[in-house]
Design a protein with these regions (language model features):
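ABC-type nucleotide-binding domain
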Residues: 1-228
């Protein structure tokens, strides 16, 4: 059983062991799956009472595995809002820190990319997906390990892009990276399909549990100390 409230315009980080239920929880929130019992509500309304188009208009998604269409970069970004002008596409790309590398491509925004975006690096593909989400401008953003496989050179630009996307939004974030979760308004620890801990970073560090072990293991692995 899970009971969770996510206030509007806050950041909720979901952490836990692999297979513990993090992705399942996000799938239920967005109604990719339906609950067997109980209910999931959005703004006090059961998600089953929304039309699928109406429900999806409330969400933007940035997944670890990015899918791009075999089309121009501009059309890939405009997928977030089909009626967007070229100027609006460029503005979204600038916010997502991908305008510079797009401008260097042979045909700029008219460059056709292969199915899956094979001609782009992982960080570039993720920034285009973030530009798409910025274009959509949905009130709720679900980030599924969006920075997990990014090389150090691209990480800062990607994090800047995520910051641009998440301003004034309700954020639900699955992540393994400590620095992306420690400033969340609430951290939810999921294990074996249950919420086993919930609170802020400071609160959870005072408890003996999965979260403290998660933090201690990462500090030991990379020999860093959290900024006080």
């Amino acid at each position: 059983d899970i009971s969770l409230s996510i206030p509007q315009k806050t950041t909720t980080a979901i952490v836990g062991p692999s297979g513990g239920g993090k992705s399942t929880l996000c799938n239920l929130i967005a109604r990719f799956w339906d609950v067997d019992s109980g209910e999931v509500t959005l703004g006090g309304v059961n998600v089953k009472d929304y039309s699928m188009n109406s429900l999806m208009s409330n969400f933007s998604f940035v997944f670890q595995s990015v899918y791009l269409f075999a089309d121009t970069i501009e059309n890939n970004i405009k997928f977030g809002r089909q009626d967007a002008s070229h100027e609006e596409v460029v503005e979204a790309a600038k916010k997502a820190c991908c305008h510079d590398f797009i401008s260097k491509l042979p045909d700029g925004y008219d460059t056709v990319i292969g199915e899956g975006g094979a001609t782009l690096s992982g960080g570039e593909k993720q920034r285009i997906s973030i530009a798409r989400a910025i274009m959509k401008d949905a009130p709720i953003v679900i980030l599924d390990e969006a920075t997990a496989n990014v090389d150090p050179e691209n990480e800062k630009e990607l994090m800047d892009a995520v910051d641009a996307l998440t301003k004034e939004k309700t954020i639900i974030m699955i992540a393994h990276r400590l620095k992306t979760v420690r400033h969340a308004d609430q951290i939810v620890v999921v294990d074996k399909g249950r919420i086993v801990q919930q609170g802020t970073h400071e609160q959870l560090m005072k408890q003996e549990g999965i979260y403290k072990r998660f933090v201690d293991a990462r500090q030991q692995a990379v020999s860093w100390k959290l900024a006080r």
